[in-house]
């Protein structure tokens, strides 16, 4: 998709206290030989373009999502010159809660996800490092800094220093340390940050003052079309570039071309379990929980970067259409993407589940929340935590919830529920190549339990393109 490009660059060399220079239109991408710190301004309730943010959910609207998809292409082509990114850093969602309902800020992560799909990770996946794998997506760093504590958020199972994200309020100066380390490491390339205006301005200001760059930084919010870059030469000189994407998104949820075909039939072997004890072991009633697995992961064993691949972006963006008429949740949940995982050779932020169902929440204007108690690789504890969270809390009675998560946790959850109801039935394994199934757990008015897989997304992984959609 074509859109006009306008790039204005204001240069102020480090060590020079020059006044603001005239804006000169240009279309020159950043120099790959410099350390380029690129700041993408995500929108929030305080700083946004008209109709990009839903005031009730503090999430993107269809228009805001379309802007992020268009922005990714502009960022890749016009700012990076189609070069590959070195690092992507997004706001830790639970550090910025909005509205009286305290919704986490998923906008920075969603804003930069399409850009991550346009870049590639190339990393080792064996101990000797002789074998490299190039993925059709890039990882996003969004995990908590070492020692960082967030009110109401469970501490991570392990700290991931290499996948630190951005803290909205810069707790402990962690954002400053992140930028300072990148400058000190002095590895040429492109480092992209996605955060709200308040946080971004603070990051640029501290970097400017600490290093004595004397750059003439913007003093006020100029809208989501602007992208700022501080570029540092090998000699240590710095300059500021201000880019204007001139993007005009459509006002509705973005369509896909081609639109993935959706089938009414499901491939998984059907099952149906029910249990009706005299006294149900859980307290909730009239509740439905839809379990959906994250979108397509990397197909190579023992290699992981926490994100999904290009096919997954097609699936995630197609979910609103694929699920229309099949499910009817009134709220959406996923695990906190700031929780980290490890493949043995590479640590990563686990963004895949939350980003899979984010477009569905956007398209349907649904409340979106994150849970930090459901962590990776801790099945026994997680199973009971999940049961207590969703089925022993009255806030979920009389509601339908969509949960995007990790497929290995679903069978233990269902089996534990059945066992608690006195049933000897156990859930089947969820096939490793199955990204399409939906497991539905229902409690009726008396608390009786049924579980089945009678519906599915209807999207065939094999028919999805292996390159990301273009906008």
Where are the language model's segments positioned?
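C-terminal motif of bacterial Sec signal peptides marking the signal peptidase cleavage site
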Residues: 13-15
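Bacterial signal peptide processing site
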Residues: 17-19
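Active-site-proximal alpha-helix that buttresses catalytic centers in soluble enzyme cores
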Residues: 21-180, 186-188, 200, 204-394, ...
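Sec-dependent signal peptide recognition
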Residues: 1-7
């Amino acid at each position: 998709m074509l859109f006009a490009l306008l790039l204005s660059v204001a240069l102020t060399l480090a060590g020079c206290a020059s006044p603001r220079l005239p804006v000169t239109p240009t279309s020159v991408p950043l120099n790959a030989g410099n350390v380029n710190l690129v700041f993408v301004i995500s929108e929030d309730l305080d700083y946004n373009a008209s109709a990009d943010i839903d005031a009730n959910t503090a999430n993107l609207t269809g228009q805001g999502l379309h802007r992020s998809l268009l922005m990714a292409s502009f960022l890749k082509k016009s700012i990076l010159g189609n070069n590959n990114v070195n690092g992507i850093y997004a706001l830790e969602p639970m550090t910025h809660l909005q509205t009286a309902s305290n919704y986490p800020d998923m906008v920075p992560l969603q804003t930069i996800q399409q850009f991550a799909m346009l870049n590639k990770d190339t990393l080792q996946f064996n101990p000797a490092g002789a074998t490299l794998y190039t993925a059709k997506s890039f990882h996003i760093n969004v995990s908590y800094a070492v020692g960082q504590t967030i009110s109401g958020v469970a501490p991570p199972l392990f700290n991931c220093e290499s996948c630190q994200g951005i803290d909205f309020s810069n707790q402990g100066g962690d954002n400053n340390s992140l930028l300072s380390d990148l400058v000190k490491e002095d590895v040429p390339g492109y480092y992209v940050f996605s955060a709200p205006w308040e946080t971004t301005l603070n990051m640029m200001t501290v970097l400017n003052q600490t290093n004595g760059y004397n750059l003439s930084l913007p003093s006020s919010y100029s809208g989501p079309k602007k992208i700022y870059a501080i570029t540092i030469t090998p000699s240590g000189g710095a300059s500021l570039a201000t880019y204007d994407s001139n993007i005009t998104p459509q006002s509705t949820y973005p369509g896909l071309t081609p639109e993935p075909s959706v089938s009414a039939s499901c491939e998984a072997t059907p099952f149906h379990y029910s249990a009706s004890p005299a006294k149900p072991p859980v307290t909730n009633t009239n509740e439905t929980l839809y379990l959906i697995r994250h979108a397509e992961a990397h197909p190579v064993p023992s290699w992981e970067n926490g994100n999904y691949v290009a096919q997954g972006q097609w699936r995630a963006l197609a979910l609103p259409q694929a699920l229309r008429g099949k499910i009817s949740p009134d709220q959406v949940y996923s695990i906190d993407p700031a929780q980290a995982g490890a493949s043995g050779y590479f640590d990563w932020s686990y963004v895949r589940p939350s980003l899979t169902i984010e477009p569905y929440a956007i398209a349907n204007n649904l409340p979106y929340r994150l849970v930090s108690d459901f962590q990776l690789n801790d099945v026994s504890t997680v199973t009971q935590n999940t049961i207590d969270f969703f089925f022993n809390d009255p806030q979920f009675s009389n509601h339908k919830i969509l949960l995007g998560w990790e497929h290995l946790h679903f069978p233990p959850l269902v089996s534990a529920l059945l066992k608690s109801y006195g049933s000897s039935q156990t859930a089947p394994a969820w096939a490793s190549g199955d990204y399409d199934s939906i497991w539905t757990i229902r409690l009726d008015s008396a608390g009786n339990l049924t579980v089945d897989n009678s519906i599915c997304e209807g999207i065939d992984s094999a028919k999805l393109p292996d390159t990301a959609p273009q906008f």
